[in-house]
From Swiss-Prot:
GO biological process: tRNA processing
Family label: Belongs to the DsrF/TusC family.
Keywords: Cytoplasm, tRNA processing
Main location: cytoplasm
InterPro entries, sorted: DsrEFH-like, Sulphur_relay_DsrE/F-like, Sulphur_relay_TusC, Sulphur_relay_TusC/DsrF
Keyword Coiled coil in record: no
Presence of keyword RNA-binding: no
Role noted for this protein: Part of a sulfur-relay system required for 2-thiolation of 5-methylaminomethyl-2-thiouridine (mnm(5)s(2)U) at tRNA wobble positions.
GO cellular component entries: cytoplasm
Originating species: Sodalis glossinidius (strain morsitans)
Transmembrane regions: none
Subcellular location: Cytoplasm
Subunit structure and binding partners: Heterohexamer, formed by a dimer of trimers. The hexameric TusBCD complex contains 2 copies each of TusB, TusC and TusD. The TusBCD complex interacts with TusE.
The name this protein goes by in its record: Protein TusC
């Protein structure tokens, strides 16, 4: 079985990487059973609740991350160091219940995947 990892490294606004990655993730979930999703660097910002993209005339796609469990995508990881660097902690309000990992731990988990797609 092919294990596929999606790594989100860009924030929710400013470019389309997050939205395109989410679209690819949802499409792939129909074809693959073992998918891991990693949020690192500015990618951790994708999971923050209470975003107001309409204020900058952007589409609100972040809430769609909340439906990943309906697609049986349950291996969700957030880089604790990336969150801390941005002044965020577990109480910040998140759209997903991702497992918080140190940089070393998420690198180890990521190495177990056959294919890695970065957005």
């Amino acid at each position: 079985m092919n294990r596929i990892a999606f790594v989100f490294t860009h924030g929710p606004h400013g470019d389309a990487a997050g939205r395109e990655g989410l679209d690819a993730l949802l499409a792939t979930s129909a074809l693959a059973e073992d998918i891991g999703v990693f949020f690192i660097a500015d990618g951790v910002l994708l999971l923050l609740e209470q975003q107001q993209p309409a204020q900058i005339l952007a589409r609100d796609f972040v809430a769609t991350f909340g439906v990943l469990s309906l697609y049986d995508v349950d291996s969700l990881y957030l880089c604790a160091e990336s969150a801390a660097e941005r002044g965020l902690d577990a109480d910040a309000g998140w759209v997903l219940n991702a497992e918080w990992l140190s940089a070393a731990d998420w690198r180890q988990r990521l190495s177990a995947y056959d294919t890695v797609m970065t957005f």
